[in-house]
């Protein structure tokens, strides 16, 4: 008997255990269903939170983590299965309750097995749901690695194929860690380096990152480090406070920890640079450095493994490049002269391009012969040298009118590769007196834009997105012209030079223009070498670290016409000696911390342009009442807001033609909008803490930039009545505006911050030229453009938009109900943060 029991016992216990589990599942079915529903609801809420975090991260360009993607996929599967199971349980329960007692007795056996099966499934699903819950992901997305290669635009080339092939072959050799590319300015070194950069796309799997850094004659290690840091995505909020040593450590740490295979492309080195000081580890098999320079000596000092010279074009290639654009073949005599002119360009692509543009409009033999005579008059011993090239390039300058020539040389005051806003450049020219404003400022600006077109057409300026810049060789040529040919005029240009004090000047009386743009100058003390009087006309000191300007610095500058002190954040006051600047026409104090205008400002009777924008500590601008010739006044974003007293002063300035303002009082805004003259000349307005309608703002016909902070923005204009009733209907709404309406036609930049009742910005449909939009901390905004309000308008919004910033808009669900194209918006100009309901990125 015992033997039999020993055989049966394991089976008995197993069956009993199985039966207990089955009975337990039946007995616990209702309780487990309740637990399953509760756990399922918690899992769904957890999933929703994770999805919102993922969407927010992806809107900022992040990629969801693989572990998060797997978890979401598992949750979606179990979500569907659990829903089906709970539906079955609900249906069974309902069927059981509706069945008769007889039917329940007849189906007891089948019901028992069905209940047992259901109970088992519910218990199993409950276990699965619990296993997926409570993951508590610290991070759900990560920033994708930077693209291996940032492709750069490159113009059509002639004669570089052989050099490109040779350079590429050398670069691909393991033993070549560093290559130096040398050649004279304008020969095509940057173009070659650009082609090399783009060629890495073909072998992107071999490298992790290709870094392009543009150097310059005055560039320092810090600026190179900044460019590398940006490319490696390690420039956080503290980066700007780091010393060069700290930056080098960070760069080195990232490169060593990541162990990337990287290529560093340094364009336009003028002297040797310590790679160790930058933070580049000892070059190994995975590292490559390629640099360009005008000097072969730099290649030697940098210890390049191989030096590659970019030579000038052959005679045939030079003619192909020139004739490709000018087409001289049909005119035999002109063609013969053109070939001689091409020969004078020494095969230099830049010279060929500039001369080609200069001669493109010349159609007679006399004009072409005159150009050749000019080139042949230059000293032959200069041929093939940098100055010899300047002489050739100067032909284009010689064809300029006197006014245009002055405007061209002025551009050399800005840093190398600096993109100058065209409207700002024209304002400088007007301030200098290069352009006569007697027919009004708008006519003067039109003439300024015409000059820019002429300089671009002559190949002396390059154009990009309403900005212009100079090729570094053209800039060098401009500075050479000033030093060699402009009698009695001398430029001192030390931009991006790391200066901590004023440069040494042998004779201040010979200097007419000085540019110390982008340096580290903190103080301008008394200098015994200052003469009793200088002849300085232009002084650029913007973007330094100035704290004090003391002594007789201003007292000896009665000839100064343009003074730019902008973006010196630590300047809190200016000396009374500013009253000595009796010739001053343009004064830029934007971005400074001045608390009040200097007492001597009122005597500057020739001042026509005063810029006080972004002066957050300035309390009053009342002194401007004495500036009767003032044409331009800017105090957008200034603490010195418009008040009734200042409004009367502005009305009395009869010469005023351009205005940007700050307003933080409702009644002042109403009175301001009631002034047809002032409202009509306003190009920028900063509104804070106001109740305002877009219809009222729409009457500012010249508005370019608009910022509203903590404003209650409405669509109708019923709150604005009185003086301007004839110019807009107080009840105007967005549905009544047509695309032909002039409102917002010039509006290019809009900033909205902390407007808590704002739901949409449909009125931006009519800002056809909007380029930049920033919206932040407006919790009720659900969409940028309301589809219903926009119906029938027939306008595609955001066609010119280039910058989009959306922050802390928790209810924002869409940009626009319909699909919107953003033809000019680039991914790196989209900044979206904390918009959890915005599931579709603009691009």
Swiss-Prot record:
Gene3D superfamilies (alphabetical): Helical domain of apoptotic protease-activating factors, P-loop containing nucleotide triphosphate hydrolases, Ribonuclease Inhibitor
Sequence ranges assigned to domain NB-ARC in this UniProt record: 141-440
Pfam families recorded: LRR_14 (PF23598), NB-ARC (PF00931), WH_DRP (PF23559)
One GO location term (cellular component): mitochondrion
Binding of ATP, residues: 183-190
Positions in coiled-coil regions: 28-58
Family designation: Belongs to the disease resistance NB-LRR family.
Protein name, UniProt field: Probable disease resistance protein At5g47250
Organism whose genome encodes this protein: Arabidopsis thaliana (Mouse-ear cress)
């Amino acid at each position: 008997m015992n033997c039999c029991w020993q055989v049966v016992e394991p089976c008995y216990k197993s069956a009993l255990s199985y039966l207990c589990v089955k009975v337990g599942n039946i007995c616990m079915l209702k309780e487990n269903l309740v637990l399953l529903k509760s756990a399922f609801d918690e899992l769904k809420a957890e999933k929703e939170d994770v999805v919102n975090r993922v969407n927010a991260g992806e809107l900022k360009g992040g990629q969801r983590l693989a572990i998060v993607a797997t978890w979401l996929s598992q949750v979606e599967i179990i979500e569907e299965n659990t829903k089906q199971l709970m539906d079955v349980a609900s249906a069974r329960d309902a069927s059981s309750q509706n069945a008769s007692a007889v039917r329940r007795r007849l189906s007891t056996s089948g019901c028992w097995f069905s209940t047992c099966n259901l109970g088992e499934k519910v218990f199993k699903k409950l276990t699965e749901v619990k296993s997926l819950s409570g993951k508590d992901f610290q991070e759900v997305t990560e920033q994708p690695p930077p693209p291996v290669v940032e492709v750069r635009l490159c113009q059509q080339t002639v004669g570089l194929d052989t050099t490109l092939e040779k350079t590429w072959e050398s670069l691909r050799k393991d033993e070549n860690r560093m290559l130096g590319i040398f050649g004279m300015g304008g020969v095509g070194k940057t173009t070659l380096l650009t082609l090399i950069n783009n060629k890495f796309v073909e072998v992107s799997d071999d490298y992790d990152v290709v870094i392009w850094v543009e150097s310059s004659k005055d560039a320092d290690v810090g600026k190179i480090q900044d460019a590398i840091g940006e490319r490696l995505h390690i420039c956080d909020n503290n980066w700007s406070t780091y010393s060069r040593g700290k930056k080098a450590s960070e760069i080195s740490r990232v490169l060593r920890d990541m162990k990337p295979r990287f290529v560093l492309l340094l364009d336009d080195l003028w002297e040797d640079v310590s790679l160790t000081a930058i933070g580049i580890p000892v070059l190994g098999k995975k590292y490559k450095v390629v640099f360009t320079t005008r000097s072969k000596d730099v290649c030697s000092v940098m210890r390049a493994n191989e030096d590659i010279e970019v030579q000038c074009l052959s005679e045939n290639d030079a003619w192909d490049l020139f004739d490709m654009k000018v087409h001289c073949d049909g005119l035999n005599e002109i063609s013969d002269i053109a070939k001689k002119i091409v020969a004078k360009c020494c095969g230099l692509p830049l010279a060929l391009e500039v001369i080609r543009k200069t001669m493109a409009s010349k159609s007679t033999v006399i004009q072409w012969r005159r150009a050749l005579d000019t080139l042949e008059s230059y000293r032959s011993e200069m041929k093939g040298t940098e100055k010899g090239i300047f002489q050739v390039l100067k032909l284009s300058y010689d064809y300029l009118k006197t006014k245009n020539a002055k405007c061209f040389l002025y551009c050399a005051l800005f840093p190398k590769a600096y993109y100058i806003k065209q409207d700002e450049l024209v304002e400088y020219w007007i301030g200098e007196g290069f352009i006569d404003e007697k027919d009004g400022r708008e006519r003067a600006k039109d003439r300024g834009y015409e000059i820019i077109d002429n300089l671009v057409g002559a190949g002396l300026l390059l154009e990009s997105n309403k900005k212009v810049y100079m090729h570094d060789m053209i800039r060098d040529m401009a500075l050479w012209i000033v030093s060699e040919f402009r009698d009695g005029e001398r430029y001192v240009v030390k931009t991006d030079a790391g200066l901590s004090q004023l440069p040494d000047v042998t004779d201040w009386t010979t200097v007419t223009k000085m540019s110390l743009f982008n340096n580290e100058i903190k103080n301008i003390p008394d200098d015994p070498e200052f003469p009793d009087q200088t002849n300085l006309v232009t002084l650029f000191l913007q973007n330094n670290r100035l704290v004090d300007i003391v002594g007789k610095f201003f007292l000896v500058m009665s000839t100064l016409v343009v003074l730019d002190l902008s973006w010196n954040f630590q300047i809190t006051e200016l000396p009374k000696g500013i009253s000595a600047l009796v010739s001053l026409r343009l004064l830029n104090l934007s971005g400074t911390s001045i608390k009040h205008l200097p007492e001597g400002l009122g005597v500057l009777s020739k001042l026509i342009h005063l810029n006080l924008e972004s002066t957050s500590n300035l309390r009053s601008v009342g002194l401007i009442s004495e500036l009767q010739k003032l044409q331009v006044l800017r105090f957008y974003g200034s603490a010195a807001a418009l008040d009734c007293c200042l409004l009367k002063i502005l009305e009395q300035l009869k010469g005023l033609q351009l205005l940007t303002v700050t307003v933080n009082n409702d009644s002042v805004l109403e009175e301001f909008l009631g002034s047809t003259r002032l409202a009509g000349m306003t190009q920028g307005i900063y509104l804070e803490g106001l109740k305002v309608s877009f219809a009222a703002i729409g009457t500012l016909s010249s508005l370019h930039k608009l910022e509203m902070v903590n404003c209650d923005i409405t669509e109708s204009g019923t709150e604005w009545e009185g003086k301007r009733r004839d110019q807009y209907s107080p009840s105007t709404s967005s549905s009544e505006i047509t695309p032909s309406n002039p409102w917002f036609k010039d509006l290019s930049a809009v900033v909205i911050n902390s407007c808590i009742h704002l739901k949409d910005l449909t009125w931006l449909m009519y800002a056809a030229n909007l380029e930049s939009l920033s919206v932040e901390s407006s919790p009720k905004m659900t969409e940028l453009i309301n589809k219903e309000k926009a119906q029938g308008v027939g306008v595609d919004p955001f066609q010119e938009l280039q910058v989009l910033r959306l922050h802390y808009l928790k209810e924002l669900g869409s940009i626009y109900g319909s699909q919107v194209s953003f033809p000019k918006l680039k991914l790196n100009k989209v900044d979206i943060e904390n918009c959890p309901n915005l599931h579709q990125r603009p691009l």
